[in-house]
């Protein structure tokens, strides 16, 4: 919805906000008007934070979690069990598990799910690096925490077969309703799903 | 909700998004992760749009609508009836009326409502400029389109008394439910409210 009554710099800004996920035209307008009301220093800080996060945040060399250093804070944390790896599709899933405060191991973020429909094969995901990581160090258990869907199940089975020769592979329990997004599941359900994980090999 | 697992530039960016109206911690996280996935050029454009809108968008000298020039596009538009002024509290209310596509006159944005509880007196609003504008030029009618609330009614009565010597003053009909925000009322209701306006003097 473009209105002739917006002045150009404002309509441009609203256009940017409309591209964000879950932001409709009215929310975009509200956010843009909010920006105009802020002191200039706040907007400069925000603008710098955007560029800084975008250029400085990369992937952990070990687990592919987001980090601004070589290794992420979870991989560097000696309090966490480095022999227990939880495999997730995306960083947002890792953050959801962290909110559940149930898991004390480390992660491996594969970057998506195998999906022939979207031409996403295993070679596009961080699966080879996972196999390498597991084969090179002593790992007690791999927990697969992927969304319960056709793609999630396919990916779980694929990784399960590859890792079976090296270590124990489990999958978090089907406590999650089918088709739901891991990101939005409540903490208690996620904790239950971790507890009730079942053996795959 | 601050998580130790966010890397600093990311948590800083999330913090900025959390300050936006109507954006909670999870939406802020989703928006920040979305930013990281965008190409750098998009983020540079967005960052520039923020600064440009903030520094270039000011107030119209005539009606105090947002504009990047001296006079806003509505005031400069010769197709619009310059003798019919609609008084609104905020720019977002003006935009809501524009969406209703019912009003063909011009506006005066007073910048808020009289509210003794919040120490907002008439002198903090663009009411003096409105009286001056009405007294200096030939105006057929002033339509007051303020939120139906104690503050809105007070402001309407105050402006109504001040302008009565100069011209006809009307108020949009009470078709709006009490306590609602003008910004969120649907277009049809707004159009009805404009049609059914009543005489104040």
From Swiss-Prot, chains A, B:
Instruction: List GO BP terms, alphabetically.
Output: DNA recombination; DNA repair
| ZnF start-end (C4-type) | 60-75
Q: What is this protein called?
A: Recombination protein RecR
RNA-binding keyword on record: no
The lineage's top-level taxon is Bacteria
Record keyword Metal-binding present: yes
Q: Which NCBIfam families match?
A: recR
> InterPro entries annotated for this entry?
DNA_Rcmb_RecR, Rcmb_RecR, Rcmb_RecR_Znf, TOPRIM_dom, TOPRIM_RecR
Toprim domain segment(s): 83-177
Q: What family, per the record? A: Belongs to the RecR family.
Q: Which Pfam families match?
A: RecR_C (PF21175), RecR_HhH (PF21176), RecR_ZnF (PF02132), Toprim_4 (PF13662)
CDD domains documented for this protein: TOPRIM_recR
GO molecular function terms here?
DNA binding; zinc ion binding
Q: What does this protein do?
A: May play a role in DNA repair. It seems to be involved in an RecBC-independent recombinational process of DNA repair. It may act with RecF and RecO.
Q: Which UniProt keywords apply?
A: DNA damage, DNA recombination, DNA repair, Metal-binding, Zinc, Zinc-finger
